[in-house]
Amino acid sequence: MIMVRRRARPAKETGGGSAAAAVASDGALSMDTAAAVAVAGGNHLLDDQYFASPKRKDCRLMKASENLKISSDVVALEEEANNKGVKPTKALTDRTIGVPLATRSQTRTIENFFKADAAAKCGITLNTHHPEPIKEQKTISTTELPLSDELGDEELERVVGDLLYDGHSTASSDSPSYQNENEHEEVMQDTFALRETSPVPVLMADFQTHRSGLRDSHSSSHSSSSSGGASATTDNIFLQEPVLTLDIDRTPTKASSIKINKSFELASAVFSSPPSVLNACRFNQIVTLNGGGQCEPQPVVVAQPQPQPQLQLPPHHNGFELDQHDSSSCDSGVACNLTISAESPAAGGGAGAAARRRKPATPHRILCPSPIKTLPRGDGGGLIVPGARKTSGIMMKGDLLSPRKSPRKLPTTTAAVAACKSRRRLNQPKPQAPYQPQQPQPPPGTQPTNEDVVAAEELENLNKIPIANSNKSNNHVKAMLKPAPAKPRAALTKGSKTKTGSKIQPGPLPLAATNGNREMTDFFPVRRSVRKTKTAVKEEWLRNLEQAVLEERSEGLQVRNFMGKGRGVVAVRHFKRNEFVVEYVGDLISISDATDRERRYALDENAGCYMYYFKHKNQQYCIDATVDTGKLGRLINHSRAGNLMTKVVVIKQRPHLVLLAKDDIAPGEELTYDYGDRSKESLLHHPWLAF
């Protein structure tokens, strides 16, 4: 819908024909009818104000009561002037006739006209919110208005136009279309002149509805400056004047672009600590830090140790190995498969629980918990004990701690690289000194012993050659420029013999033959290495063990009684790691003999169990130390976290069990080792085996 903006028009005058028709009618329009027409006009005025947009800057809403009061005041002034016979001195141009409407009312649609026409024909009246009755002005002679049905369409439009239009609205005068004040005053004067010729006094009612009160409270910047304080403020935030404005920066901006770098450059350290191997596994590419070149993803390979099963090695013949990773507990179980026949009272199926509880056939067994693998030496001796863990050898020097405390062993490649470096360093060519002319070598019989002094004297003699004998000296120098022929190396070889068989000791080479350089061995003797190889260290250590077994050493040990254990052995001196402590001495018997002895010991209530089972060269053996021989090895108590370990040493084709220090043992510490028996029957009768 297109809105057309119009200027304020003067109030239309009712035609003479209309006035005559009104006088000639049957009767004047009653006061109720006049009030109804006025109220209908005010109602349509409110509807027209409702359609006015409060967001327009040139829009202004006024109260209907004030506009109606203005019309009543105009009629009162005209009547007072007629009574006095004098025209009003005050110009009526300052007054406003009708209701001051907004610009939207000036550009109303045809719909408002039909609404006013329908209301006038039906004669509908509006009840105001004011309970006061309509006051009549007795001083004003009421003039009858023609009925709406008697008036034509043209006259009805004029009457409604007088009620709805106000050419002197301050809101309209403040709009941009009324910037010329002189023109506005002329239009207002013409309007009042027309109204004075034929006044139409109408009794108006002062009313105000609730909805109009809420709408009229809205005031804009234009209405507040021209209404003279007529508008009021409201608490409705939707009808208040906006106080915030948007200041949009309309300056043109530069075109932005996105740059993608091919590599990332780190300005500072990203990680507070060095990255670990696990962090390196989380990334599959390496980012260059120099910012140049393309970064290609490179896989990061991290070697992770995988647990390997324990293997049993076949017999070796080049050396032996010592178990360096012995644990405090033994999971090897029973080393030999012993079965108790039905004749045993403890193992018989028909025997009762009392027979079993009386004494087991095997109270407990001393099993080799972690026997150390021993490779046979050149004489054919040695042991291979299956079930033990694979070891990498022993170290005597600098390896005196337990496997948990021992330093990490260097790989063999390190020693090979060091040897290659030493070989390259020794095979480097000798630096050549500048050639210096020297005098012929004197006869061997007159050669002094101190060669340094002789060389210094030769240099001094060369500087003191007289100038007169220049020819002789030149010839002499030319002769010295030719180096003396070196003797063949074969003749100088140490230990070489002549035809007569006598050895020739090599003498020092002349300085001319060596170009003025001397051998390092002329000043320093040859230093021989005193370090021993790993094989030599092992052999020496085994010889010491054999010597200790043959001598039956038991030094630094003492027997003591312990609460709940009985007798035990403590150390009275310091023992180093892998040092010989004591031998487990007893009768070396086979498995069949051990089975018979177990049956016999089961019948004796006072007999203990001192039978040590172990395996040697894929054959099961047992050392029976039940008989008290006074040896201290049989008195060492059990502990799963013991400080001793067992090793098999072969001497004269006979295996011996020796106990070595697993860690450094301080004086006063009890000596213990793991018996290795984890059978249910043994744990049932001897619960202390679990500790």
UniProtKB/Swiss-Prot annotation:
Keywords (A to Z) from UniProt: Cell cycle, Cell division, Chromatin regulator, Chromosome, Methyltransferase, Mitosis, Nucleus, Repressor, S-adenosyl-L-methionine, Transcription, Transcription regulation, Transferase
Pfam families from the UniProt entry: SET
Cited SUPFAM superfamilies: SET domain (SSF82199)
Enzyme Commission designation: 2.1.1.361
Gene3D superfamilies in the cross-refs: SET domain (2.170.270.10)
Key word Transcription regulation present: yes
Gene Ontology molecular function terms on file: histone H4K20 methyltransferase activity; histone H4K20 monomethyltransferase activity
Catalytic activity: L-lysyl(20)-[histone H4] + S-adenosyl-L-methionine = N(6)-methyl-L-lysyl(20)-[histone H4] + S-adenosyl-L-homocysteine + H(+)
Cited function: Histone methyltransferase that specifically monomethylates 'Lys-20' of histone H4. H4 'Lys-20' monomethylation is enriched during mitosis and represents a specific tag for epigenetic transcriptional repression. Mainly functions in euchromatin regions, thereby playing a central role in the silencing of euchromatic genes. Required for cell proliferation, possibly by contributing to the maintenance of proper higher-order structure of DNA and chromosome condensation during mitosis.
Name listed for the protein in its UniProt record: Histone-lysine N-methyltransferase Set8
Lineage, top ranks: Eukaryota, Metazoa, Ecdysozoa, Arthropoda, Hexapoda
